[in-house]
Amino acid sequence: GAGFSHEAFGSQAVFRSALMALSHPGRCIPVEHDAELPRHGNAAAAVFLLAMLDADCGLWLSPSLRDSDAAMWLRFHTGCQLVEHAAMAQFVWVGAGDSLPVLQSLRQGSDECPDQSATCVVDVGSLSASADADAQHWTLSGPGIREQATLSVTGLPSDFAEQWAHNHAGFPRGVDLFLATHDQLVGLPRTTRIHTPVEA
């Protein structure tokens, strides 16, 4: 498939959506684009990476994406380098149903250069501000959130909130993460705290 019909405008629109998602953690941000997408991987994740990657970027793909048309599509349109180990990558894309790498095993940046950390994009089944059945339901707090935000997610491992607590505790080091469906992104910068409901 083709990339954006107009590369600069297409990339800028997706970049603005991603910036909005990071500026307002937990908010479901619609992603609009006109790119012809690969068959594999969630569309919002694919166009996010299409906008962000270039020839200097290392990308790690989870097993279901590694040998798919998504890998060839991103390499062709961005020139990115596919890396074998997630710990080497600036960007990590985890397909639906694939195991999430341990967040602390990814590039964490340093106190002096926290921006040298990895950005992780995870395909999920659904994203919603309301409490959905069969979803993990969280309350979020931190910079960019007025008091609290709520988020329901399906398709993440059951220990994700615990992993995220370790990621948050390492600030200013740590990874920033995007959750992606076919048409929405949710940003989770490392400054965001996830609060899980207390079990009765």
Regions found by a protein language model. Name each.
Residues 1-58, 62-65, 76-77, 183-184, ...:
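N-terminal, charge-rich interaction modules
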Residues 68-187, 191-200:
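Internal, well-folded beta-alpha domain core
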